[in-house]
Amino acid sequence: MGQTITTPLSLTLDHWSEVRARAHNQGVEVRKKKWITLCEAEWVMMNVGWPREGTFSLDNISQVEKKIFAPGPYGHPDQVPYITTWRSLATDPPSWVRPFLPPPKPPTSLPQPHSPQP
């Protein structure tokens, strides 16, 4: 029997009613067909490392946001509801997203101040 691999995109589609409700709670509307197109094509073509299957990596989401929120004719205001909803899933994940979150980055240690030697 064939098994399908669950990806961040397929996961959001499997829970589409919850994704739409989350967007609605943020005051925006998202459409399934556009969600798929943005994830599989538009964001991939931005050449910022977005994978076709989607990701809950905040680094990748931030890179896409930089393109979407770019000023003037370079931005993509029509995509704002989609990337903000995607970020919301990554930063405040429902139980079905948690197993797909990337592992947290180890904290970077800051240099410790040296006490003066007598």
Curated annotation (Swiss-Prot):
A lipid is attached at G2 (N-myristoyl glycine). GO terms for cellular component: virion component. Keywords: Lipoprotein, Myristate, Virion. Residues 97-118 are annotated as: Disordered. Residues 100-118 have a biased composition (Pro residues). It is found in: Virion. SUPFAM superfamilies: Retroviral matrix proteins. InterPro entries: G_retro_matrix, G_retro_matrix_sf, Retroviral_Gag-Pol_poly, Retrovr_matrix. Specific enzymatic cleavages in vivo yield mature proteins. It comes from the Viruses. The keyword Oxidoreductase does not apply. Its main location: virion. PANTHER family: GAG_P30 DOMAIN-CONTAINING PROTEIN. This protein is synthesized as a Gag-Fgr polyprotein. This is Core protein p15. The gene is gag.
